[in-house]
């Protein structure tokens, strides 16, 4: 009798585990929405210029935060550019490093800009931030590359990405 009960309980457990394994697990939904350049303009009223030789260009938005993003590859490196409405200067990059070698007295278009670099010997992260005061838009462009990026000019790529809202800068 004990053997029969053990067999029945084992069979019930197997059925339960099988049912659980076949039930899809609901996770947190991805808040990022893949879109197009036109979709960003329609939904958020912002646009990126795509650098001429860029490949694998992907647009997405975090609509609840009015955050637009463009990922692309250029000359063997991966980049992430972002735009978000803002009333003041803020870091929207999502890159959390101890920035060294910062540069502050320059512009992207006619916008005040900041650039920083962080390196750990194996990889180097570069970030450029700029703020277009008139429309109230904060911009960021970042990349992480292997090794030393000496001589690399992220600001030149930022100029290619920036689409002035007020016309030519």
Model-derived segments and their meaning:
Residues 1-22:
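Sec-dependent N-terminal signal peptides of Gram-positive bacterial secreted proteins and lipoproteins
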Residues 3-4, 30, 151:
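A generic helix-loop boundary/linker signal
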Residues 12, 53-57, 160:
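Generic detector of isolated residues embedded in canonical secondary-structure elements
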Residues 13, 129-131, 141-144:
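Short beta-strand element of the conserved SAM-dependent methyltransferase core
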Residues 13, 24, 166-169:
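Soluble, non-membrane globular domain cores that form compact, hydrophobic packing
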Residues 23-135:
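Short, solvent-exposed recognition patches
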Residues 137-169:
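Surface-exposed amphipathic alpha-helical segments
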């Amino acid at each position: 009798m004990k053997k029969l009960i053990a067999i029945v309980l084992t069979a019930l457990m197997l059925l339960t585990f099988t049912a659980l394994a076949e039930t899809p697990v609901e996770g947190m939904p991805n808040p990022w929405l893949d879109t197009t350049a036109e979709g960003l303009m329609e939904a958020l009223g912002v646009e990126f210029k795509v650098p001429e030789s860029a490949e694998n260009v992907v647009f997405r938005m975090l609509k609840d935060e009015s955050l637009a993003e463009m990922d692309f590859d250029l000359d063997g490196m991966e980049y992430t550019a972002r735009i978000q409405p803002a009333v003041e200067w803020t870091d929207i990059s999502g890159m959390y490093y101890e920035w060294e070698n910062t540069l502050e007295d320059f512009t992207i278009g006619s916008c005040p800009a900041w650039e920083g670099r962080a390196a750990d010997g194996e990889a180097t992260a570069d970030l450029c931030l700029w703020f277009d005061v008139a429309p109230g838009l904060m911009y960021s462009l970042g990349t992480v590359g292997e090794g030393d990026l000496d001589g690399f000019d992220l600001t030149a790529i930022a100029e290619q990405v920036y689409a002035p809202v007020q016309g030519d800068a």
